[in-house]
């Protein structure tokens, strides 16, 4: 029978509940347990697919095509289980499901209320999500409840968790509460009062934390932990200090050294061998002792909020791990390049244009791509980054000066990138779409297997086949592919049924390393295994840096 750990947050949001949950999961997995995770989001949106990155950060895409919270990316990077649609749900999905049942008459004429109908539905979703991994036989399911204690939006989720722990019985559920202990510079001390009030608020709704994770910018002294334990009505060893570190991959060791996994296993009556965190120790050692160093320029329009590119940033770090390289990322606002000032690109060892939507900043990205192509700087384009690479090549190499995407210019003479107008939905029905269709859930989503052309960089990186996740509405227009290929571009991977370009590259005679992919490889990169594409990209950046150094000496 699966046991549950509910992770809640207090005082403020963005304390790192997702990292804490993923780190605990990693420790429990290292003890030989099968672990899965769920994220419960209190917002009324059905999913984050149409939310602004400034509001929500990255949208993480699962293998089965769900647009989910970025915390699911942390989960997949920290544990071996693959997340699915059932591992993330929102208030919007809960209410949608309950209203559908009410319309079908499933409540037999009863008054539909938050308690019990909404809370029962939340519990049903939690139990369904816990069975999404490990063939439904997970030993532990860690359930992260979004928001903070005291938010009106989170109350039904907290109430559902309380009811569920009561229904499951003793030693079947535990609660971990993450809270803030701020340091007041003017007083020169840490203040525990916000944490005391947060735990008090949690206890008011019937939840007593099993363990308390206290976030601060420094380790919390024992006397402050003793004070917190007194007011929180819990043992002092269950008050765990979680201070700021330079890499999130130190967190599992930090929590293990303070006995969090022991406390949880004792509460849940789980008998498991000691944790083996040697892999995490090696990882941290490699991060702290790199043999090489490069700087990659990430050209985008959300560069002021790097959470928008969370999986991509981590994928580059993973590649650094597997090549003993410190990867520095310079975030470049694409709008600032539109005036033609490309001096900021001159010191870079490689250039990357990530995925995105909308016209704003695209001409600046195209200038960066042109610079990378003409100056033979290694280039990786992801999703929109590949589409813009095709547009840049069409304009400046293939002679189509007006080339563009219909996303940016419906009247373009050469629509080398165009809207996907027809595809199958998840039930196998063929759907027609237009620019006026709903935005939510109307993209090519999820993993897809694609054959790779032999003798290409793509085949050197991936072998015979690519299996990556997608999230896009627009595709390279097949009508223009012959003209692009005639000018030198190589389409190195195509979808088997529609024959749509999935990867493009330039031959070695034109550029040492210039690759674009329509999919999102960052979603499948992990610190354990890295990712072959990002590893090849970092190696290309190292080679470019070495060539530049040799030219400087000559």
From Swiss-Prot:
Family, per entry: Belongs to the CTP synthase family.
Record lineage: Bacteria, Pseudomonadati, Pseudomonadota, Betaproteobacteria, Burkholderiales
PANTHER family recorded: CTP SYNTHASE, CTP SYNTHASE-RELATED
PROSITE patterns with a match to the protein in the record: GATASE_TYPE_1
Biological function: Catalyzes the ATP-dependent amination of UTP to CTP with either L-glutamine or ammonia as the source of nitrogen. Regulates intracellular CTP levels through interactions with the four ribonucleotide triphosphates.
Residues at which Mg(2+) binds: 71, 144
Protein's name in the database: CTP synthase
Single GO biological process annotation from the record: pyrimidine nucleobase biosynthetic process
Residue pairs linked by disulfide bridges in the UniProt entry: none
Gene3D superfamilies named in the record: 3.40.50.880, P-loop containing nucleotide triphosphate hydrolases (3.40.50.300)
Gene: pyrG
Species of origin: Ralstonia nicotianae (strain ATCC BAA-1114 / GMI1000)
Note: CTPSs have evolved a hybrid strategy for distinguishing between UTP and CTP. The overlapping regions of the product feedback inhibitory and substrate sites recognize a common feature in both compounds, the triphosphate moiety. To differentiate isosteric substrate and product pyrimidine rings, an additional pocket far from the expected kinase/ligase catalytic site, specifically recognizes the cytosine and ribose portions of the product inhibitor.
Binding site for UTP: 13, 191-196, 227
Entry keyword set: ATP-binding, Glutamine amidotransferase, Ligase, Magnesium, Metal-binding, Nucleotide-binding, Pyrimidine biosynthesis
């Amino acid at each position: 029978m699966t046991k549950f750990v509910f992770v809640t947050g207090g005082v403020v949001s963005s304390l790192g509940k997702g990292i804490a949950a993923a780190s605990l999961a990693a420790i429990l997995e290292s003890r030989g347990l099968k672990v899965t995770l769920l994220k419960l989001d209190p917002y009324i949106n059905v999913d984050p697919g149409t939310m602004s990155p400034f509001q929500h950060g990255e949208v993480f895409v699962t293998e089965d095509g769900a647009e989910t919270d970025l915390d699911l990316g942390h989960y997949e990077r920290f544990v071996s289980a693959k997340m699915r649609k059932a591992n993330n749900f929102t208030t919007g999905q809960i209410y949608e499901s309950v209203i559908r049942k009410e319309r079908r008459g499933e409540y037999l004429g009863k008054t539909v209320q938050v308690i019990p109908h909404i809370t029962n539905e939340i519990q049903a979703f939690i139990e369904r999500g816990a069975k999404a991994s490990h063939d439904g036989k997970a030993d532990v399911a860690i359930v992260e409840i979004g928001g903070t204690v005291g938010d009106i939006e989170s109350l039904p989720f907290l109430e559902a968790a309380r009811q569920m722990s009561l229904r499951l019985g003793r030693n079947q559920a535990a609660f971990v509460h993450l809270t803030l202990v701020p340091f007041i510079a003017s007083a020169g001390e840490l203040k525990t009062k916000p944490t005391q009030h947060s735990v008090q608020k949690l206890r008011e709704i019937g939840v007593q934390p099993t363990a308390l994770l206290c976030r601060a910018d420094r380790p919390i002294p024992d006397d402050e932990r003793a004070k917190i334990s007194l007011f929180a009505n819990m043992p002092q060893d269950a008050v765990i200090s979680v201070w700021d570190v330079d890499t999130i991959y130190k967190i599992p060791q930090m929590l293990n050294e303070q006995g969090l996994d022991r406390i949880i296993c004792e509460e849940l009556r789980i008998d498991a061998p000691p944790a083996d965190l040697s892999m995490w120790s090696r990882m941290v050692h490699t991060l702290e002792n790199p043999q090489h160093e490069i700087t990659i320029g990430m050209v985008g329009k959300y560069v002021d909020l790097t959470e928008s590119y969370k999986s991509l940033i981590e994928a580059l770090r993973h590649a650094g791990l597997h090549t003993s390289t410190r990867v520095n990322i310079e975030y470049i606002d694409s709008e600032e390049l539109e005036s033609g000032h490309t001096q900021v690109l001159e010191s870079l060892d490689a250039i990357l244009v990530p995925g995105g939507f909308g016209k704003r900043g695209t001409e600046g990205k195209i200038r960066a791509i042109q610079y990378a192509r003409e100056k033979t700087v290694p280039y990786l384009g992801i999703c929109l980054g590949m589409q813009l690479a095709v547009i840049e090549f069409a304009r400046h190499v293939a002679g189509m000066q007006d080339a563009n995407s219909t996303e940016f210019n419906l009247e373009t003479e050469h629509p080398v990138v165009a809207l996907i107008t027809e595809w199958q939905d998840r039930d196998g029905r063929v759907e027609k779409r237009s620019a006026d269709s709903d935005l939510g859930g109307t993209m090519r989503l999820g993993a897809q297997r694609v054959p790779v052309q032999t003798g290409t960089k793509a085949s050197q990186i991936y072998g015979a086949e690519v299996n990556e996740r997608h999230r896009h509405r627009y595709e390279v227009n097949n009508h223009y592919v012959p003209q692009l290929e005639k000018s030198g571009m190589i389409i190195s991977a195509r979808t088997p049924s529609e024959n749509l370009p999935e990867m493009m590259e330039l031959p070695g005679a034109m550029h040492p390393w210039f690759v674009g992919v329509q999919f999102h490889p960052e979603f499948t990169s992990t610190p354990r295994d890295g990712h072959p594409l990002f590893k090849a990209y970092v190696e290309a950046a190292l080679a470019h840096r070495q060539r530049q150094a040799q030219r400087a000496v000559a």
